[in-house]
Amino acid sequence: MEALYLLASLATTLLTSTLLSLLLLLRLPFARRSARGGGGAGATRLYEGRVRHSRRRPAGHAFEYAVRYALVDLDLLPLSGYLSAADARRIASTSGPVRLLTVPKSVGYEQNPLSVYYCYDEAAQEQDEHLKMCIAEVTNTPWGEKVMFTFQPGSDLVAKPLHVSPFMDMLGNWSIRADAPGNNLYVAIAVQHPTLGNYFTAALDAKLVGQTNDSVKLATFFWLMPHKVAAGIYWEIVEIS
C-alpha cells in the first residue's frame, strides 16, 4: 500500500507540475515590464547559493547541491502557509520587521527543509546588530513533519527537536547560526552528539542576485527548485543506504 501511495503521489505531482509549467510558459509573453517588477518597497530578495551536508562519523559522507532562496518582508507581503509578521513578533518577543527566508512553492510542489524568520528590533534598518531573534521552521524528509523553534542568531544551542534523517538518532543538540541577510547569506546547523561528538554539519551559503515584485519573474526564478531539492535529498538517501 505504501508503494502504491508513493507512486500515486509521484504521478499527481508530475501531472500537476507539468500543467502549471505550461500555464507559466503561456504567461511569459504577457509579463509586466515595469519599474515595479525590478524592485522597490516590498520587493522579494533573490539568493543563489549552495547547501552542503558533511557527515564525519560513523562513516564519512558529504554532498552539496545548488539552491535558490527568497527573502520576503512579511509586513509587506504576507504568505499563506507561513507565520504572519505579527505572529512571528509575538513568538520572538520583538517589535520590528520580520523577514522570511524560504524556498517558495513551485508549480504546485513544496519541498522546503528549512525556513528562517529574521526578527528585528523596532529601530532596525539593515544593521546586523539589530537582528534580535530568529525562528527556524524545519521539515524532515521523507515524513514531512515540521517543528518550529527560536534561537539567537549569532550562535545558539537547542535540544534536537525533530527526527530529520533515518540515519540519525534523536540524541544530542543542534548548534545553529544565522547571519543577518545582506549581500551574503549564511545559515549553519551542526549536530552535537553525546557519543559521536560534532559529527554532522549542514550549511547554506548564498549571495544576493536581485530582487523583484513581479510574480512571473518569481515563478520563473524558482521554477522546479523544490523538485530539485527533493531529488537531491532522495538521491543521497539512496547513496547512503
Go through each PLM region and give its residues.
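Mature, function-bearing regions of proteins
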Residues: 1-241
